[in-house]
Amino acid sequence: SMLYAIGIACVKYSKFSYLNTLFHLMLPEYSSPDSSGRIYFLNKLHPCYWDKDDLNQLNGTNYKTPLSTILSKQLRPYFQKEIFLESEYISTFCIFEYLLSLNFKHIGGLSYAPDWAPWGEFRWRTMIFMRGNNDLYSTFFAQAESQKNNWEPIKQGMFDGKYEVYKKLKTKIQTSTSTAH
């Protein structure tokens, strides 16, 4: 939950360079000078790391994204003073998870499942966001399309500071999450 707490705060306060650094952390025991054994933190900790059915069974729930939903509910009280509206919190949470998914794909993903990327609440909430109007989530990612290399996450170094890298990753993520079960 620490990853998520830091991530939500980074999104809320537009600290994307910090978030980028967090996403690129490596596990020390796997670090090697020639980068052949590089294992990124995100490869071991993401919202799909644990089996959905096992988590639901343990918690007596039937969530589409159990870890994401549990973390969202668990962390909400800590952001009450900074994020007043529930809708803003949910949007901020989903922005973080989508950025996590994009960055997971960007740093290399899983060698044995190159087309896969983790997904969270953003996967099923996107349709809800699209039906509403003036929501933070849709606006945030629409800014990428209009601002391109001037979009704040890109300006702060995410996606190698290039809109084209982001756009390719976004297409890959949309493909992988639309075919995920």
Residue ranges and their predicted role:
Residues G7-S17, L58:
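Short coil/turn connectors between adjacent alpha-helices in alpha-solenoid helical repeat scaffolds
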